[in-house]
C-alpha cells in the first residue's frame, strides 16, 4: 500500500530522518522529517494552471505548531489552535525567504507549502527541521524549483561554533544564527548576537553553510528515488520585448533616476512607463507584445539602468556614492507625556519611536509549545500606508510588520539591562512615518534613543544599517544605507545592527548565486563603518541613558524576602497583601523566588509598602527598643503589636518597676507604649518589657535598675528567658495560702 522511501544521517550528534510515501500522498510533494524526537510534516501543492494577470510568484508558506506535539492542550475558551502565533509567522517567513529566489523565473502557478509540527522533544527547535522538510518536499514535488536548500542553526559557546545547539544551549550561547542556502551559495541569514565581531559572524555563516551540505546530499538521494516527474513548464522568452522596451525607455529612465526626491522620481518613471506601453502596445493596429509582457520587461529595464549606472559611475539614484549614508536628524523627548520618545530621520525614512515602562503585571504571557513563559521586552513595528504616500489596509499587523519588529527586537535586546537591575517591563513602538528603505534599521536607531530618553540604562547605544549589492559578472558594488529602489533592484538585502563593540543582529537575504565569502566580508566591514557614523550622529541627541526615569514612568523598588516568609506577606486568602495595596496604592508582585517588586508613580507609596513588607518579614533584634500598641490585656500580662505585624507579650512582672496587682491598672488596649525586645523562648514566643524603658523618652533603663538594686543590696535577677513563658499559668494564689497548704494547716 505504501511505497516508503527514507534517508537517514547523523547530523550534529543526532539522527535526521527524511521519509516520503506514507503520509499526505495526494500532495504534489510530502516529507516527514524527524530530528531527535522533533517531527514535522511538510507538504507542497501547486496549481495546475498559471494565474492570469499577475507578474509575481504566488507562493504561500504556512508553518503551524500543534499543541499535541508537546503533549499539551491549547489554552483559551475553545481549546484549539487559532490565529498564527508570532513564532509561527516568523518561521513561515524563515522558510519562505531562501526558497522564493529558487523558483524558475516566470512560474505563476499558485504554490502552497504547509509545514506542521507533529512532535516536539523540547530540545530541538522545529524551525530548522521545518526548513529541511520544506526543501525536501519541494524537491520531490516536480515544480520548477532549483533547490534543494539546506539549513542549520549555529551557536557560539566557549569561543567555538556549535552546530544545531539544543534549546538549553541556545540560552547560554552568545549567538543564535540560522543560515540557509544551496550547495554553492548562502541565501538567507537570521541572527541575534551579544556584540560579536564581524569575523565571528561571518565565520558562523560559513560554518553553517559547510555543515548543512550533508542534508542537501540526503535530499538529493531521496529525490533520486522518489521525485515526481518535473512539471511541463518552459520559462517565458522575453529577450525581444526587453530589448524593445530598453530601446524606447533607456535614455528617459536614466534622466528619471537622476531625480533625488522619491515622489518626483516615481512620477517621472511612471510617465516613461506609460510612454513605453503606448509605443509598444498601440490601441489601434496589431500589438506585437501584450501589455503584461511590456510591463514586466519595463521592470527589467529599470533594474538594468540603475545597476549599470552604479557600476559604471559609482553614483547612485540620489547622487550618493556607494559608501555615503543619507543625512540624519535625531531628536529625543518629542512627546510630552511619553516615558521616552525619539524622532529618527534618515533621508526620506523616518521613525517615531516611543518607549513605555511598566510593571511585572504588564509582561506578555506567551503560550508556546515549550510551555508558558513571560516576556519583559516588547517591540512593535507599525508601517501605515501613508508612510509611502499611498492608501491601503489598516488593521492587525501583517507578516512583514511582525518580521521587521522582531529584527529590531533582536538588535536591541542584547544591550538591555538584566531584570534584576532594571525590573521594568519595556515596550517600544516604532511608527514608520516616512519610508524609503531601511525602516527596520531606523526603528533600531530610534528605539535605542527612546529607551535612553526614558532612562533605561542600556549597556551601549545600538544602531542599524541596511546594505545592498549589485553584482554583474566580476564587477560588484556594495551599497551603504540603501533606498527602497536599490533594495528591489539589487541582489542582496543585508541588515546589520550593533553597538560600537560588535554586532547584535544580522539579517541577510541574497537573491542570486555567486556572492562569495570575500564579498560578504567587504559588506560587513563597510556596514561597520556606516554603523559607526550613524552612532556618531545619534550621539548628538543623546549619548547615554538619562540619569532619572521619565517624569510619568512608574517607579519600581525591588526587595528580596525569604521564601518561607512569602505566605506571611500574602496572608490568608491574600488578606495582607490586599491591605497593603489598598492602603498604600502601590502595585506589588511577589515571585516564587522571594523577589518582591513594588511599583507606583508615587515614591511615598513605594516607601510605605516597602516598609510594611519589611516589617512583616524582618526579625526584631534582641535588646532593641520599639514603639508598640497594646492590642490585648490578659490577667498575666499585655500583648503588644510592636514590629509590623508582630505581637509579643509583656508579662505582668515586666509592666513596671513596682509590683503590679492588675494589668489594667497600668495599661489599656490601644495605648501607645515603648517596649524592649528581650528575645523569644524555645517555642518562638516573643517576650517584651516595658519596665526597663522610659515611657517618655524611650531610654533603656536596664543598667539604671541594676544599679538601684545593687544599692539596695538586692541580688541580681535572672533573665526571664531562662524561665520560659509563664503567662499561661493563671493568676497567682495568695502567698499566705500557699504557705498554709505546705505546712498542712
From Swiss-Prot:
Its EC number is 2.7.7.8. Residues 695-745 are annotated as: Disordered. Keywords: Cytoplasm, Magnesium, Metal-binding, Nucleotidyltransferase, RNA-binding, Transferase. One of its GO terms (molecular function) is magnesium ion binding. PROSITE patterns: KH_TYPE_1, S1. Residues 623-691 form the S1 motif domain. Residues 701-745 have a biased composition (Basic and acidic residues). GO terms for biological process: mRNA catabolic process; RNA processing. Mg(2+) binds at residues 487, 493. Residues 554-613 form the KH domain. It is found in: Cytoplasm. Pfam families: KH_1 (PF00013), PNPase (PF03726), RNase_PH (PF01138), RNase_PH_C (PF03725), S1 (PF00575). It catalyses: RNA(n+1) + phosphate = RNA(n) + a ribonucleoside 5'-diphosphate. Its cofactor is Mg(2+). GO terms for cellular component: cytosol. SMART domains: KH (SM00322), S1 (SM00316). It is an enzyme of class 2 (transferase). Involved in mRNA degradation. Catalyzes the phosphorolysis of single-stranded polyribonucleotides processively in the 3'- to 5'-direction. Belongs to the polyribonucleotide nucleotidyltransferase family. NCBIfam families: polynuc_phos (TIGR03591), PRK11824.1 (NF008805). This is Polyribonucleotide nucleotidyltransferase. It comes from Methylorubrum extorquens (strain PA1).
Amino acid at each position: 500500500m505504501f511505497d516508503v522511501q527514507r534517508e537517514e544521517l547523523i547530523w550534529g550528534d543526532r539522527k535526521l530522518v527524511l521519509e516520503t510515501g506514507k503520509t499526505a500522498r495526494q500532495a504534489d510533494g510530502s516529507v516527514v522529517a524527524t530530528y531527535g524526537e522533533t517531527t514535522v510534516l511538510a507538504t507542497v501543492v501547486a496549481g495546475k494552471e498559471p494565474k492570469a494577470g499577475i507578474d509575481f510568484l504566488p507562493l504561500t508558506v504556512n508553518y503551524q505548531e500543534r499543541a499535541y506535539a508537546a503533549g499539551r492542550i491549547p489554552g483559551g475558551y475553545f481549546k484549539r489552535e487559532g490565529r498564527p502565533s508570532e513564532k509561527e509567522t516568523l518561521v513561515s517567513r524563515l522558510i519562505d525567504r531562501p526558497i522564493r529566489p529558487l523558483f524558475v523565473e516566470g512560474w505563476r502557478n499558485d504554490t502552497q507549502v504547509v509545514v506542521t509540527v507533529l512532535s516536539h522533544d523540547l530540545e530541538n527547535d522545529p524551525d530548522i527541521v521545518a526548513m529541511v522538510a520544506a526543501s525536501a518536499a519541494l524537491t520531490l514535488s516536480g515544480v520548477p524549483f532549483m533547490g534543494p536548500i539546506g539549513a542549520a542553526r549555529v551557536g557560539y559557546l566557549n569561543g567555538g561554533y556549535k552546530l544545531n545547539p539544543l534549546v538549553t544551549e541556545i540560552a547560554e550561547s552568545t549567538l543564535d544564527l540560522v543560515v540557509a542556502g544551496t550547495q554553492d551559495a548562502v541565501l538567507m541569514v537570521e541572527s541575534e548576537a551579544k556584540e560579536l565581531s564581524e569575523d565571528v559572524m561571518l565565520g558562523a555563516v560559513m560554518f553553517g553553510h559547510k555543515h548543512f551540505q550533508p542534508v542537501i546530499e540526503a535530499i538529493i538521494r531521496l529525490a533520486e528515488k522518489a521525485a515526481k516527474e518535473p512539471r511541463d513548464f518552459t520559462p517565458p522568452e522575453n529577450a525581444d520585448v526587453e530589448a524593445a522596451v530598453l530601446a524606447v525607455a533607456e535614455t528617459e529612465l536614466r534622466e528619471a533616476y537622476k531625480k533625488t526626491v522619491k515622489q518626483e522620481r516615481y512620477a517621472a518613471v511612471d510617465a516613461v512607463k506609460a510612454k513605453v506601453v503606448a509605443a509598444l502596445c498601440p490601441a489601434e493596429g496589431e500589438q506585437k507584445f501584450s501589455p503584461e509582457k511590456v510591463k514586466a520587461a519595463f521592470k527589467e529595464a529599470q533594474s538594468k539602468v540603475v545597476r549599470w549606472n552604479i557600476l559604471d559611475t559609482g553614483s547612485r539614484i540620489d547622487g550618493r556614492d556607494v559608501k555615503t549614508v543619507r543625512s540624519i536628524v535625531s531628536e529625543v523627548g518629542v512627546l510630552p507625556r511619553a516615558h521616552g520618545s525619539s524622532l529618527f530621520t534618515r533621508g526620506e525614512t523616518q521613525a517615531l519611536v516611543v518607549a513605555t515602562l511598566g510593571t511585572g503585571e504588564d509582561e506578555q504571557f506567551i503560550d508556546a509549545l515549550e510551555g508558558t513563559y513571560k516576556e519583559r521586552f516588547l517591540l512593535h513595528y507599525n508601517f501605515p500606508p501613508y508612510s509611502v504616500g499611498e492608501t491601503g489596509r489598516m488593521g492587525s499587523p501583517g507578516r512583514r510588520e511582525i518580521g521587521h519588529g522582531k529584527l529590531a527586537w533582536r538588535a536591541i535586546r542584547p544591550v538591555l539591562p538584566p531584570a534584576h537591575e532594571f525590573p521594568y517591563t519595556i515596550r517600544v513602538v516604532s511608527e514608520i512615518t516616512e519610508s524609503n528603505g531601511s525602516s527596520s534599521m531606523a526603528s533600531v536607531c530610534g528605539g535605542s534613543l527612546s529607551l535612553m530618553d526614558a532612562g533605561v540604562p542600556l549597556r551601549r547605544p545600538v544602531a542599524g544599517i541596511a546594505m545592498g549589492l549589485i553584482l554583474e559578472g566580476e564587477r560588484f558594488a556594495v551599497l551603504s544605507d540603501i533606498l527602497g529602489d536599490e533594495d528591489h533592484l539589487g541582489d542582496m538585502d543585508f541588515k546589520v545592527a550593533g553597538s560600537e563593540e560588535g554586532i547584535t543582529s544580522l539579517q541577510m537575504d541574497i537573491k542570486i548565486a555567486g556572492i562569495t565569502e570575500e564579498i560578504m566580508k567587504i559588506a560587513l566591514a563597510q556596514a561597520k563603518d556606516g554603523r559607526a557614523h550613524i552612532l556618531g550622529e545619534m550621539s548628538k541627541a543623546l549619548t547615554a541613558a538619562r540619569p532619572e526615569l521619565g517624569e510619568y514612568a512608574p517607579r519600581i523598588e525591588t526587595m528580596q524576602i525569604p521564601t518561607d516568609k512569602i505566605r506571611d506577606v500574602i496572608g490568608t486568602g491574600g488578606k495582607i497583601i490586599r491591605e497593603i495595596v489598598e492602603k498604600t496604592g502601590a502595585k506589588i508582585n511577589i515571585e516564587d523566588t522571594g523577589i518582591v517588586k513594588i511599583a507606583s508613580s508615587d515614591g511615598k507609596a513605594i516607601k510605605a509598602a516597602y516598609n510594611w513588607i519589611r516589617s512583616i518579614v524582618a526579625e526584631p533584634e534582641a535588646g532593641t527598643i520599639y514603639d508598640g500598641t497594646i492590642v490585648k490585656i490578659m490577667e498575666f500580662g499585655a500583648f503588644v503589636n510592636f514590629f509590623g505585624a508582630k505581637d509579643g507579650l509583656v508579662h505582668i512582672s515586666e509592666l513596671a518597676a513596682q509590683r503590679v496587682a492588675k494589668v489594667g491598672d497600668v495599661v489599656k488596649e490601644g495605648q501607645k507604649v515603648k517596649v524592649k525586645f528581650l528575645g523569644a523562648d524555645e517555642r518562638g514566643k516573643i517576650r517584651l518589657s516595658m519596665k526597663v524603658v522610659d515611657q517618655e523618652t524611650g531610654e533603656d533603663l536596664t543598667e539604671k535598675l541594676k544599679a538601684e538594686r545593687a544599692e539596695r543590696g538586692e541580688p541580681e535577677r535572672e533573665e526571664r528567658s531562662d524561665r520560659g513563658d509563664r503567662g499561661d499559668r493563671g493568676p497567682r494564689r495568695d502567698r499566705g495560702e500557699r504557705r498554709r497548704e505546705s505546712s498542712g494547716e
